[in-house]
Design a protein with these regions (language model features):
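Extended soluble regions of mature proteins
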Residues: 23-203
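Bacterial Sec-dependent N-terminal signal peptides
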Residues: 1-26
Length: 203
C-alpha cells in the first residue's frame, strides 16, 4: 500500500479543507452605507445614509436624507411590516403586507469578473438588469452572508454581503450606495421596538 509522507498528507488535507470552505452565515450584523448621487460628469454628492440592522429573521433599515427619515422594520417569517416616516416634526406609522414587497423582476444578470477589496473584504461584482429598464451593479463579498438579504429585494439571490451597489435608471440617473462600516457585534432586541404613541398611524 502506498504511504504518503506526513507533509504531503497535511498539504492535501489543507487543500480539501479550503475547497470545502463555505460562506459564513452571520445572524447579527449592522451595515452603514453612504448614498451618493452621481452627476453626468462623474462628480459625486453625498445625499444621505442608509443603515441596516439584522438579527435572526428580523431586519430594520433606516434611510436618512436632509428632507426625511424613513424606517422599515420586518421579519421574514411574518406577514406584516412597519414603515416609519419622519418629516420635520411630523411622524407617521404605517403597516404594510410584507408579501406585497415583491421581488424585482430581473431579466438578466452578468458577472463582471472584477475583483476588489472593500473594508478589507474581497469582493466581486455582478450587474443585474430589470424589466423596467433599470440596472444595478452589485459588489459583494462571499466571506459572509447575513441571515436576511432582502433589505433590497434585488439582493435575494446575491450569495454574500453587499458592500456597494449602484442603481442606474433607464433615464441615466445614478445613485451609489457604499458601505463605510460593517459591525458584527450582537444586536439588542430593542432596536426593533417602536414606541407607537410617538407616531400618527396612517393607512
Amino acid at each position: 500500500m502506498l504511504r504518503l509522507p506526513p507533509i504531503i498528507v497535511c498539504f492535501l488535507s489543507c487543500v480539501v479543507f479550503q475547497s470545502q470552505a463555505q460562506t459564513k452565515v452571520v445572524g447579527e450584523c449592522a451595515i452603514t452605507y453612504d448614498i451618493h448621487q452621481i452627476a453626468s460628469n462623474g462628480d459625486k454628492s453625498l445625499v444621505g445614509q442608509k443603515q441596516i440592522f439584522i438579527k435572526g429573521n428580523s431586519c430594520k433599515t433606516i434611510l436618512k436624507t436632509p428632507a426625511f427619515t424613513q424606517t422599515l422594520i420586518f421579519n421574514t417569517q411574518q406577514d406584516t411590516a412597519i414603515i416609519l416616516k419622519e418629516i420635520g416634526l411630523n411622524k407617521f406609522l404605517q403597516y404594510i403586507l410584507y408579501a406585497s414587497m415583491q421581488p424585482v423582476n430581473l431579466v438578466a444578470s452578468k458577472k463582471n469578473g472584477t475583483i476588489s477589496t472593500i473594508l478589507d473584504y474581497p469582493c466581486e461584482t455582478i450587474t443585474l438588469s430589470s424589466a423596467d429598464g433599470n440596472a444595478m451593479e452589485v459588489t459583494y463579498t462571499t466571506v459572509i452572508i447575513p441571515t436576511v438579504t432582502v433589505y433590497e429585494q434585488a439582493f435575494k439571490e446575491i450569495p454574500g454581503l453587499v458592500m456597494r451597489y449602484q442603481l442606474t435608471t433607464k433615464e441615466g440617473n445614478k445613485i451609489l450606495y457604499s458601505a463605510n462600516k460593517v459591525d458584527l457585534s450582537p444586536i439588542t432586541l430593542n432596536v426593533f421596538e417602536v414606541n407607537k404613541s410617538n407616531y400618527q398611524q396612517i393607512n
